[in-house]
UniProtKB/Swiss-Prot annotation:
Cofactors that this protein relies on: Zn(2+)
Family: Belongs to the class-II aminoacyl-tRNA synthetase family.
Xref: NCBIfam families: thrS (TIGR00418)
Identification of the protein by name: Threonine--tRNA ligase
Organism encoding this protein: Phocaeicola vulgatus (strain ATCC 8482 / DSM 1447 / JCM 5826 / CCUG 4940 / NBRC 14291 / NCTC 11154)
Pfam families assigned to the protein according to its UniProt record, in alphabetical order: HGTP_anticodon, TGS, tRNA-synt_2b, tRNA_SAD
Cellular localization per UniProt: Cytoplasm
């Protein structure tokens, strides 16, 4: 008999070789119908896999990310099976589950797969899913796998297999389709009830631009048609909120191939928005005793060799810059932490000096594949609101609490009200890959858990998800249309202090390693602005919006009065513009509404005679007339009340 420990701490005994599905059935037949995958000692596996030893065990349903992942991974195989029937001779690349759905990269040979072909492929997928095909996992020798896929002319699969370590590899078969795959998968295609293929795109094989361009088909599936219908409604709303569209309408940022792909340029209004965000965070950080630094945009190759980033991320960096005089190599800065380690090392440190909190709005550059670039959310140059905290092991919890305060202020000020968190801890069993002492890990893990409890933050604990150098806490927010975005991370790091030989003198007069904590409430300025645009549909909080007021003279003869109104409002720190175009007032109102300006002040003969303005509020329409001073005071008070909340 083996002992199975459930998340609530309860333990049950089962026969060796029991499967996850059998365990679910032993609890309830209804549960067995709903589960999609299971977790065994931190590893997500198929429900049909036998369990042969004592294990920590969890069942995953649709509501769990692991459940969705297995569902969409199987859906990718279902797509491939349909393509195999419809396009004989098609070759397959990779087909993973992604955050929202799945894709498969294929080489259809002479055939061309267009978006007009997607409905027919969907229909074939539905036909196959209805057969409730069982997925069969098989472990075979590497040479047998090469032979099997080679006989089918699967050159892409053979390339992947040849790079695997010698030994046994796994395949999954459903119906007539067999794929090279680690899993996990559903037990059958039966749960897949609603299917939608979304787009067709090009993607270079393995992301390398000198390789074959394949056809990438994106899709999403659900266990119920109602879920798909709701998702498609959300997609339509997401198109309206696309930050690329709204950013152009509001004149916030631009891209041009002349400057380079993935290199955003911030226009005056977008720059004003960024500056306000940075000043906002600077004020908060000052309250929490952060010291701001500035580092160069490049670094010597040896810096990144020491940090380990060169070995791990060298391929994601731009080509090195060679200095002919010194014969050295420099890289565009891909991250800020190595520079901050050198700042820490610049002076001797005592335990009394800690914690040391170093912050920087540091611009970094990473070579993202052109096919992965997307507006502001995936770029090649971006600015991180980075901070690195150097502290003693006994200070980790307090530092987490302080950073959580800052992140909470950021989210509340931007009207992100639905916040989730995930604590990523070590694998419960396999701990060889982690750097740092068990004692320090246990202290840090417990500190994160206790910090979440003290703040009343509901956090999901994921074992085995920690980086090799430390546990972390990730924050996910739901936007106005229900999408989840990962914003804000607090990461413990035992690796860089070791690599850079960072030290402080302890109260025992002995040298000790500090604990390093990475944190970024925004993540990056670019991605945060993109998420904020899509969350608010461009209707930013009044204190943040680039232009708070548009003054609209009804004809040219009132332009001078409009300028006087602007000058008066400036006394109240109101950011106003004058729309003095020779256009009808209706056109001006529509255009400024599209620019999401919160207030419009219409001025004509009556307003000029009485020193007044006719007020319109975004989304609410006419608010009547006011004296200029009264409006200025009211607006200043509205902004002040917002800012004083945090």
């Amino acid at each position: 008999m083996i002992k199975i420990t459930f998340p609530d701490g309860s333990v049950r005994e089962y026969n060796e070789g029991v499967t996850g599905l059998q365990i679910a059935e032993s609890i309830s037949s209804r549960l067995a119908q709903d589960v999609l995958a299971c977790g065994v000692n931190g590893e997500t596996i198929d429900l049909s896999r036998p369990i042969n030893e004592d294990a920590n065990f969890v069942l995953y349903k649709w509501e769990d990310e692991q459940g969705k992942h297995a569902f969409w991974h199987t859906s990718a195989h279902l797509l491939a099976e349909a393509l195999q029937e419809l396009y004989p001779g098609i070759q397959f690349g990779i087909g993973p589950a992604i955050e929202n759905g799945f894709y498969y990269d294929v080489d259809p040979g002479e055939a061309i797969i267009k978006e007009a072909d997607l409905p027919a492929i969907e229909a074939k997928m539905a036909e196959l899913a209805a057969k409730k095909e069982i997925l069969v996992r098989q472990s075979i020798a590497k040479e047998d796998a090469l032979k099997k896929f080679g006989e089918r002319g699967e050159t892409y699969k053979c390339e992947l297999i040849s790079e695997l370590e010698d030994g046994h590899i796994t395949t999954y078969t459903q119906g007539a389709f067999t794929d090279l795959c680690r899993g996990p998968h559903l037990t059958s295609t039966a749960p897949i009830k609603a299917i939608k293929l979304l787009t067709v795109a090009g993607a270079y094989w393995r992301g390398q631009e000198d390789r074959k361009q394949m056809t990438r088909i994106y899709g999403i599936t659900f266990p119920k048609k109602k879920m798909l219908d709701e998702y498609l409604v959300m997609l339509e709303e997401a198109k309206k909120r696309d930050h690329r569209k709204i950013g152009k309408e509001m004149d916030l940022f631009m891209f041009t191939d002349m400057v380079g792909k993935g290199l955003p340029m911030w226009l005056p209004k977008g720059t004003a928005l960024r500056i306000r965000l940075q000043d906002f965070l600077r004020r908060i950080q000052a309250r929490y005793d952060y010291q701001e630094v500035m580092c160069p945009p490049i670094g010597n190759k040896n810096l990144y060799i020491t940090s380990g980033h060169y070995a791990k991320y060298g391929k994601d960096s731009f080509q090195p810059i060679h200095t002919p005089e010194e014969g050295e190599e420099y890289f565009l800065k891909p991250m800020n932490c190595p520079h901050h380690c050198m700042i820490y090392k610049n002076s001797p440190r005592s335990y009394k000096d800690l914690p040391l909190r170093i912050a920087e709005f540091g611009t970094v550059c990473r070579y993202e594949q052109s096919g992965e670039l997307h507006g502001l959310t995936r770029v090649r140059s971006f600015t991180q609101d980075d901070a690195h905290l150097f502290c003693r092991p006994d200070q980790v919890k307090e530092e987490f609490l302080r950073v959580m305060d800052i992140i909470n202020i950021v989210f509340k000020s931007m009207n992100f009200e639905n916040v989730e968190a995930q604590i990523s801890l070590r694998d419960k069993v396999n701990r060889e890959k982690y750097i740092g002492s068990d004692e320090n890990w246990e202290k840090a893990e417990q500190a994160i858990i206790e910090a979440c409890e003290e703040k009343g933050l509901t956090a999901k604990v994921e074992y085995g998800e920690a980086a090799f150098y430390g546990p972390k806490l990730d924050f996910m927010v739901k936007d106005a249309i229900g999408r989840r975005w990962q914003l804000g991370t607090i990461q413990v790091d035992y690796n860089l202090p070791e690599r850079f030989q960072l030290e402080y003198m302890g109260s025992d007069n002995q040298k000790h390693r500090p604990v390093m904590i990475h944190r970024a409430p925004f993540g990056s300025m670019e991605r945060f602005v993109a998420v904020l645009i899509e969350h608010t549909a461009g209707k930013f909080p009044l204190w943040l919006t680039p232009d708070q007021v548009a003054i609209l003279p009804i004809s040219e003869k009132f332009n001078e009065y409009a300028e006087q109104v602007k000058a008066e409002l400036r006394k109240f720190d109101v950011r106003a513009i004058v729309d003095d175009r020779n256009e009808k007032i209706g056109r001006k109102i529509r255009d400024n509404e599209m620019k999401r300006i919160p207030y419009m002040l219409i001025v004509g003969e009556k307003e000029a005679e009485n020193g007044e303005v006719a007020v319109r509020k975004q989304g609410e329409g006419d608010k009547g007339t006011m004296k200029i001073e009264e409006f200025g005071k009211n607006l200043a008070e509205e902004v002040s009340n917002m800012i004083n909340k945090w």
